[in-house]
C-alpha cells in the first residue's frame, strides 16, 4: 500500500470537518499530517472515557501535540467525557482549567455540571457534548444548546 504524502492530501470539503481521535502523540501527528481538521485527545486519568494502558497523553505530550497541530492549522479538542465523582469533582475542573491554559480549542464533556463550570469559568471555551452525555432527542439537544451555547 502506498504511503500517504502530507503535501498531497486533498483539503476537506467546505463546510465539513474531519475530526480524528488521537490516542498518542504519534497518532495525533499522523492525523494532522494526513488532513485532519481537528483532533481530540484525553488525559491518562479518570477524566477520560478511553483511559486505557498505553494510550493518551500526559501534560508534556498534550503541550507538544497542541503546538504541532496549531502550527499546521489543526484544532485540538480535549475529551473530559466521564462523570465527576460527587464527593470529588476537583480533578475534572482542574483538568478543564489545565486544558484552557494549554490552549485547547474546545472540550468534549458528558456531565452537565462540568458544562456549567466551563460556561461560568471559561465563557470563551467551546463546549461539545460527548456521546457519553446521551442526548437522544431533539428536546435534549435543544436543552444543551440553550443552556450552554
Task: Locate each region found by the language model.
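Non-catalytic helical/linker scaffolds that mediate oligomerization, partner binding
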Residues: 1-149
Amino acid at each position: 500500500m502506498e504511503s500517504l504524502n502530507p503535501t498531497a492530501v486533498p483539503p476537506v470539503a467546505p463546510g465539513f470537518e474531519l475530526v480524528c481521535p488521537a490516542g498518542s502523540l504519534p497518532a495525533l501527528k499522523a492525523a494532522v499530517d494526513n488532513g485532519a481538521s481537528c483532533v481530540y485527545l484525553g488525559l491518562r486519568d479518570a477524566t477520560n472515557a478511553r483511559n486505557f494502558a498505553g494510550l493518551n497523553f500526559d501534560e508534556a505530550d498534550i503541550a507538544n501535540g497542541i503546538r504541532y497541530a496549531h502550527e499546521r492549522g489543526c484544532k485540538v479538542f480535549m475529551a473530559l467525557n466521564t462523570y465527576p465523582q460527587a464527593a470529588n469533582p476537583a480533578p475534572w475542573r482542574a483538568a478543564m482549567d489545565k486544558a484552557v491554559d494549554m490552549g485547547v480549542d474546545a472540550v468534549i464533556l458528558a456531565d452537565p455540571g462540568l458544562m456549567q463550570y466551563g460556561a461560568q469559568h471559561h465563557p470563551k471555551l467551546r463546549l461539545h457534548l460527548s456521546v457519553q452525555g446521551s442526548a437522544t432527542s431533539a428536546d435534549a439537544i435543544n436543552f444543551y444548546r440553550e443552556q450552554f451555547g
